[in-house]
């Protein structure tokens, strides 16, 4: 399926909240919540997007003409490229009231398995979502990472029990969801967690723990000290704090602070293989992408998602080739200017 066809189909199917813009840059959706927008004043997603595009590439083609390999080893798993599809809490609340997030999670896992990347799924606003996601991950060889919101410690541990039984290659805990208005509305016990509580959860999990929602070097050090195997530099796509810095802006200081201690994933406004290259050049180990995976799902379900993944792969390989990187470990800050 051609990606242009995916976008054309998505426009017909996605519902009123997303316009399937030629550039998924957060301008049209603004602060539309419920929907794909950012927390008021509504500029967070666009700030993320602009920050990546402010980073320029240093082209250098005086290198041996050798094949480009985008594969990495990540938390004990080999991935064909450093890419994870990001979790989504609900389609009914955010996009289309007739749609089921479980089908989206299933399609993402299928596409991830086909393409050799990783997917993830949230615990959602529906109690049926998390158990289904764990079963989906198990069915697809543990490729889908469960992502757990900061509810009560009792609820978190119950979800970790399900994750431990399904044995995906990692599990993630989101610290910044405490700022999601719709989560607090349906789950009044949602809230921030202390470093001691994070340490308790990391020890409770039987698989590598990824802490999502890190936006400062100080926060990254606290997550690493708590026992996280990886962190996700994320402002929740601009959905939890108006006026937050862009993820590309804070990534360098976080890499410098903990890059030798934990794996670093970054999300927020990453839309192309060239953006993936920019993130890796700063020092990230992998990236997460959310909104375009939703668009691709509405444009062709599993086939649409596969089309988007392969588009990203082609763009990443082309950028690597033109900047002199033949494998992911070749990419460094000398290949960009920012």
Identify the function of each model-found stretch.
Residues 44-130:
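N-terminal functional module of multi-domain proteins
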Residues 110, 138-139, 151-266, 273-296, ...:
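Alpha/beta enzyme core
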Residues 285, 301-329:
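Internal helix-turn-beta structural module
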Residues 2-80:
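An N-cap/entry alpha-helix motif that binds or orients negatively charged groups
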Residues 330-338:
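A short, charged, Gly/Pro-tolerant segment at domain boundaries
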Residues 129-155:
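Long, hydrophobic, well-ordered secondary-structure blocks that form the structural core
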